[in-house]
Regions:
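Catalytic-site signature segments of enzymes, centered on catalytic residues
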Residues: 185, 197-198, 262-351
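Active-site-proximal loop and beta-strand segments within enzyme catalytic domains
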Residues: 161-162, 193-198, 202-203, 218-296
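Active-site-proximal alpha-helical segments within enzyme catalytic domains
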Residues: 303-310, 350-375, 432-448
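Active-site SXXK
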Residues: 178, 199-226, 250, 307-311, ...
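Classical Sec-dependent N-terminal signal peptides that target proteins to the secretory pathway
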Residues: 1-21
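N-terminal leader/targeting segments and the immediately adjacent pre-domain N-terminus
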Residues: 20-193, 224, 252, 462-466
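Active-site helix/loop module of the DD-peptidase/beta-lactamase fold
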Residues: 220-258, 315-354, 371
Length: 466
């Protein structure tokens, strides 16, 4: 068993190194094609080292002592690791940036890492490029996009944070009393070659909250009876612990599945990741014959993917009209919005792509529904009332998900310092944040490459200001 586990690890590391090289090559190619030559230099070792990354690398790739030539391996590292030599690849042109490639979270920066600006620039490109081969569900812009009014101030805390070295911040928007008050975007000489006003940026788990908002519209459209409806009319999850579940329990991440799936481990039985395989595949294998355990907060993405695909199942041919109604007619998006499908399947995944202002447009639509007590607003108030306790042992002022006591309907609720205020939060990997103060008509939207910006100053402090 240990040998088998070691083989899996070696295989993973080998794939990770190959993937890292291909991603660097894609980044360098993008720099060339877009004229960012200030970040490029000719690889003087190209002719000598080309094809050294192949399995049959010849004698020309090695020194007389049998070690690989320093100029042909990454960082001159001649050691032979579990995944072999770290060949530098076949790039004729290479960037002149100080980039660190991480492999312990696949294609993502590990949560606790605090990389330099060069590394952050690479990953900003990579997070967009990583999904280029995924099938997409595309929502076209509104014919009448919402136009924001502005009454801008320069906030020293936000300005300092978005320009300082090693800050991963891409965009900051503060909307209050129907106007944009703070509007900052990363400078051109920082991450601006990758991220602009028209860049569709990845939502990560903010997309979970969008799925809930879509679910509310499906209920109000009569496709689903209520949040207490059971999912026993959907064959994809038959004979699994989710079959007899109420929708509200899956929305609340309390479906009693903690013995079978977690955010850290994926599907416990196999280690398969819930964003990489279809629900049907899980139902026929790891989840077959499973029974739910006691209800408790167990945050992970499979719950959301089940909800999303259940909505698609229930709305059928009307799904596209439902999405157009939400994003084109209500939020009135200015640019294209899309979500991606899982691998080669037709299963939707909660990963959305929007521009910075369109994130704000959707957040405003959510706030307007709540304040106007529409049918969807009543749905939002229902999931707020039906929230569950996260039972966290400690709270940290680093992101809304870690500084809220409750979770309801795919939203983070009950800010620790918020007393009785109605504040709802959306939280995505790498520091993506949308926080809506419903009582004070205030919205904060943050796009970021990674964690590490001063959340306490630019989010928490702003929420405390009346």
């Amino acid at each position: 068993m240990r040998k088998f586990s070691l083989l899996i690890l070696i295989s993973f590391l080998t794939i990770s190194n190959v993937s890292a090289n291909s991603e660097l090559e894609a980044f360098d190619k993008w720099l060339i094609e877009n004229g960012h030559t200030q970040y490029l230099e000719i690889n003087k070792n190209f002719e000598e080292c080309k094809n050294c990354s192949t399995w049959d690398a010849g004698p020309r790739c090695f020194e007389e002592n049998g070690k690989p030539k320093k100029q042909c391996v990454l960082d001159g590292d001649q050691s032979y690791g579990e995944s072999g030599y770290k060949w530098a690849g076949n790039r004729k042109y290479k960037n002149n940036l100080d980039i660190k490639i991480y492999t312990d979270r696949g294609t993502e920066i590990p949560e606790k890492a605090r990389p330099n600006d060069d590394t952050l620039l690479f990953y900003a490109h990579d997070y967009i490029d990583d999904y280029k081969n995924n099938k997409r569900f595309l929502i076209s812009p509104s014919i009448n996009p919402f136009k924001f009014e502005s009454d801008l101030i320069e906030d020293r805390d936000v300005k300092k944070e978005i320009t300082r070295k090693k800050s991963p911040l891409l965009s900051y928007l503060l909307f209050e009393d129907d106007k944009i008050i703070i509007d900052e975007i990363t400078p051109k000489d920082k991450f601006g070659i990758v991220f602009q006003n028209d860049t569709q940026w990845v939502s990560h788990s903010i997309g979970k909250s969008f799925v809930s908002y879509i679910t509310g519209h499906a209920i109000c459209g009569g496709y689903i009876e209520s949040v207490d409806s059971q999912l026993n009319d959907w064959g994809a999850i038959k004979n699994t612990l989710y079959e007899e579940q109420k929708l509200i329990d899956i929305l609340n991440m309390s479906s009693g599945d903690q013995n079978h799936v977690t955010e850290r481990d994926g599907l416990k039985k196999s280690g398969r990741w819930f964003n990489s395989h279809s629900i049907k595949s899980f139902a026929e294998n790891e989840l077959r014959g499973t029974k739910k355990s006691s209800k408790q907060y167990n945050y992970h993405g499979l719950n959301t993917n089940i909800i999303f695909n259940y909505v698609i199942h229930k709305t059928g041919d009307d799904f596209k009209n439902l999405m157009n109604n939400i994003f084109q007619d209500k939020a009135r998006i200015e640019d294209e919005v899309w979500f991606v499908y899982i691998g080669n399947s037709l299963d939707a995944r909660y990963t959305f792509f929007l521009t910075r202002y369109d994130y704000l447009r959707v957040a405003k639509a959510i706030m307007d529904d709540w304040k106007n007590d529409t049918c969807v607003g009543k749905y939002l108030k229902t999931i707020y009332e039906r929230k569950i306790n996260k039972n966290r042992k400690e709270y940290k002022t680093t992101q809304i998900g870690r500084y809220t006591k409750s979770y309801g309907g795919q939203f983070h609720l009950n800010l620790v310092s918020g007393k009785d205020r109605n504040i709802i939060g959306m939280d995505g990997y790498g520091g993506q944040q949308i926080v809506i103060d419903l009582d004070n008509s205030k919205i904060i939207v943050i796009n970021s490459v990674h964690y590490g910006y001063d959340w306490n100053k630019i989010v928490h402090k702003k929420l405390k200001q009346k």
